[in-house]
Amino acid sequence: MELTKEGQAALDIILKSAKDNGIDIKGGKIRRTSSRFCLGVEHGDYNGTELFGVGTDRFIWLAYKPNGTNKVRLFSGNFPDDGVVEFDLGNVPEPRSAQIAETWGRFPYGIEYILRREGYKLLQGIDGVLYGNIPGGGMSRSASLTLNLILSLFDANGIEVQEKNKIVDLAQAVENDYIGSPCGKLDQTMILFAREGMGTYYNPNDRSIEYLPIGSGASDFRIVVLDTGTDRPGLEKSTYAIRRAECEKLVSILQKADYDISCLADIKDETVYKKIIDEFGESHPDLCDRLRYIFNAQNRFYKMLEAWKAGNIETVGQIFRVDGIGLRNDYKISGPELETMCDIVRTVPGVLGERMLGGGDKGASGALVRAESVEAVKQAVDTAYPRSRPDFAEKYAFHICKVVDGVRLYEGLL
């Protein structure tokens, strides 16, 4: 299997980094993990909703090989100032400690910690070099990195895990329990299970996956990611953590009021929803706003799925846009730069829908765009965004994404 042009460029960076930093990857393997683009329900995973999304072609590449010792030695081409992250298996910093707060090394540390805690015997260290081109927020860079390292350490140690949802759980535990980031399972699921050319539907009730191609006759469209040039420091330091806590608080309040629910997604009946708003809207207006977004987005989700299967990308785009308005106005999870991007592209004919992506505050927005309108959208962004957000005039980026496999392994290239 050959690398794409972008993959070869990444490999060139990896090979130079390996040479400059004394990392031996000769004869090893390359694992590529994707980013993800969620079509619904954004912020639904920790609220119990069904999910739908695709893997997208912004990646993290890891070139690695077993080194015959109990040491892990890793270098990131994206964070060269951190130098080589090196540690012995079984000897990593404590979870959430000050020692890990400012280094990307918290991810491999956390993976070693969680795998050991869960009973996996890691005896074989690796040498590896990483490089990625996933934007700094909105496309699940941390989940992609975590999955890549878990799979690579399993491979080096001859560990096979048949149940892929277990790998999702391990990746989530690294962020939840070690790093302190309160992420759900959306990102890991949408990346690990992603298939080229397919939408991935996830049902949390039985953790089943269904692959859905877009229906025949769909208009030719592109997934566009609008990287604002801002970089979110991490979910644990973001509005995401506050919103998740608010949703959990509302569930607790409703349970004490004898509502038979375990998560906000359990509120599907409009009569029950209206009763809750009437009962708690005055005493807990912010919490009811969060419910308003989840309730309406969940109802729209089923219409979006049917539209996707029917090839009606126009309706998919309309729902994507309305979800964005709900995320901005009711969930209040967006950010000024994210909304600037949305405001710019919304005015361009051929844009079917646009909204913020991912955890919120910073990072990237996304749009569904008719193929013939992509260049006009790019010109609009290039003209208006630097003028509106001069601090990020040299940092923003415009990505036209393909739907790809979430994980690929390359051999014989090193």
List the predicted regions and their residue ranges.
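C-terminal nucleotide
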Residues: 1-36, 40, 61-101, 114, ...
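Glycine- and acidic-rich phosphate- and metal-coordinating loops
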Residues: 112-135
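DPxDG-like acidic metal-binding loop motif
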Residues: 55-58, 139-159, 366-369
